[in-house]
C-alpha cells in the first residue's frame, strides 16, 4: 500500500492505473476507521481493480461550534486497517494540500438540505460537495463508495454527480451495525458507558417506524410519536435533535407512500450526536 500526501503524486499514480486500463474504486473518509469503512473497502475490492481511500478531516464541513479540532484522528491505526483491508493507495493530505489558496468560487447546495442535518448544520453540505469535487477530480474513480448511514449526504452527492456530469458510479452500502443494532460511527467513542448501553434504542425506534409503514400506517404524526416514545424509554440522551419522515432522495414531505421514504433520527448525547435512518422503497445503486 502506498501512502500519498500530495496531489501531484496521487495524480501520477492514478494515471498509471488508468493507462493499464484498471478500474478505480474510491472510499472517501475522515479517518478514525472502523468496520463500517472497511465494509466499503471490501465492496470496492470486489468490484474494482484498484482501491483508493482518502483520510481527510475536512474543515469546511464543520460549523463554528462543531468538533473539528476534537474529531478523533489516528493515522497509524487508519493505515494499518487500510492495508489489511486491501487498499492500494491511502491519500492523507494536509488541509493546505486540499485548500492551498482561498477559494475563488463556492459550491452551494440548494436542494435536499432544508431539513435534518442540512437545517441543523448550516453550510455543512456545501463543505461536503466542495471537498468531494476536489477529490473526484484528483482520484477520477469509476466507483465511489458511501454508507447508507449518511443518507442525506448520499442524496446530496447524487445531486452533485448528476448536476456536474461526474463520470463516477455511486455505490451505496447498507449501514454496518454493532451486534446490538447501533450504527457504527467514529463518534461512538464519545459515549459514556450508560449512553453506549442505551444508544441502540435509536435503531429500535426506526425499526418500529418501518413496521408501522409496512403495515399500511400513513399517519405521519402517529409514526413519529411512536418512535419518540420508544427513544424516550431511555434517559441518558440530552435531546432528540430530529425524528422525521421525508420522501427520498428529495427530502420533501411524503405524498406517495409507495415511493422512496427515509425515516431519519439524530439524538444528542453528552459528547456525541448520533444519526441513523431507515430507507423504505429505495433501490440502492
From Swiss-Prot:
* Sites where the protein binds ATP: 30-37, 147-150, 176, 184-187
What does the record give as the function of this protein?
Catalyzes the condensation of pantoate with beta-alanine in an ATP-dependent reaction via a pantoyl-adenylate intermediate.
Catalytic activity reads: (R)-pantoate + beta-alanine + ATP = (R)-pantothenate + AMP + diphosphate + H(+)
Gene Ontology annotations of biological process type = pantothenate biosynthetic process
Which top EC class applies here?
ligase
Location(s) in or outside the cell: Cytoplasm
* PANTHER family documented for this protein: CYTIDYLATE KINASE/PANTOATE-BETA-ALANINE LIGASE, PANTOATE--BETA-ALANINE LIGASE
Q: Which domain of life is it from?
A: Bacteria
Which GO molecular-function terms appear in the entry?
A: ATP binding; pantoate-beta-alanine ligase activity
Assembly description: Homodimer.
The keyword Amino-acid biosynthesis is annotated on this UniProt entry = no
The record's similarity note reads: Belongs to the pantothenate synthetase family.
Summarize where beta-alanine binds, as residue positions: 61
UniProt-listed Pfam families: Pantoate_ligase
EC number, UniProt record: 6.3.2.1
Protein name per the record = Pantothenate synthetase
Q: Name one GO cellular component term.
A: cytosol
**Which residues are noted in the entry as (R)-pantoate-binding?**
61, 153
**Entry's HAMAP family?**
PanC
Amino acid at each position: 500500500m502506498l501512502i500519498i500526501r500530495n496531489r501531484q503524486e496521487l495524480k501520477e499514480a492514478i494515471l498509471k492505473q488508468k493507462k493499464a486500463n484498471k478500474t478505480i474504486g474510491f472510499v472517501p473518509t475522515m479517518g478514525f476507521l472502523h468496520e463500517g469503512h472497511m465494509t466499503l473497502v471490501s465492496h470496492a475490492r470486489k468490484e474494482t481493480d484498484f482501491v483508493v481511500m482518502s483520510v481527510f478531516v475536512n474543515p469546511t464541513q464543520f460549523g463554528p461550534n462543531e468538533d473539528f479540532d476534537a474529531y478523533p484522528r489516528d493515522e497509524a491505526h487508519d493505515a494499518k486497517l487500510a492495508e489489511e483491508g486491501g487498499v492500494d493507495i491511502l491519500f492523507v493530505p494536509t488541509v493546505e494540500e486540499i485548500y492551498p489558496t482561498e477559494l475563488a468560487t463556492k459550491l452551494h447546495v440548494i436542494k435536499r438540505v432544508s431539513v435534518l442535518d442540512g437545517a441543523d448544520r448550516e453550510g455543512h453540505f456545501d463543505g461536503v460537495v466542495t471537498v468531494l469535487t476536489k477529490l473526484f477530480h484528483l482520484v477520477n474513480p469509476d466507483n465511489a463508495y458511501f454508507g447508507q448511514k449518511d443518507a442525506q449526504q448520499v442524496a446530496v452527492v447524487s445531486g452533485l454527480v448528476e448536476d456536474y456530469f461526474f463520470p463516477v458510479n455511486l455505490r451505496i452500502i447498507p449501514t454496518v451495525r454493532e451486534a446490538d443494532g447501533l450504527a457504527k460511527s467514529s463518534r461512538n467513542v464519545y459515549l459514556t458507558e450508560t449512553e453506549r448501553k442505551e444508544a441502540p434504542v435509536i435503531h429500535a425506534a426506526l425499526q418500529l417506524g418501518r413496521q408501522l409503514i409496512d403495515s399500511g400506517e400513513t399517519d405521519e404524526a402517529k409514526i413519529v410519536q411512536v418512535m419518540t416514545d420508544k427513544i424516550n424509554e431511555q434517559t441518558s440522551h440530552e435531546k432528540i435533535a430530529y425524528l422525521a419522515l421525508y420522501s427520498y432522495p428529495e427530502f420533501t414531505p411524503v405524498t406517495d407512500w409507495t415511493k422512496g421514504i427515509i425515516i431519519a433520527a439524530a439524538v444528542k448525547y453528552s459528547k456525541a450526536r448520533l444519526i441513523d435512518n431507515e430507507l423504505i422503497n429505495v433501490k440502492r445503486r
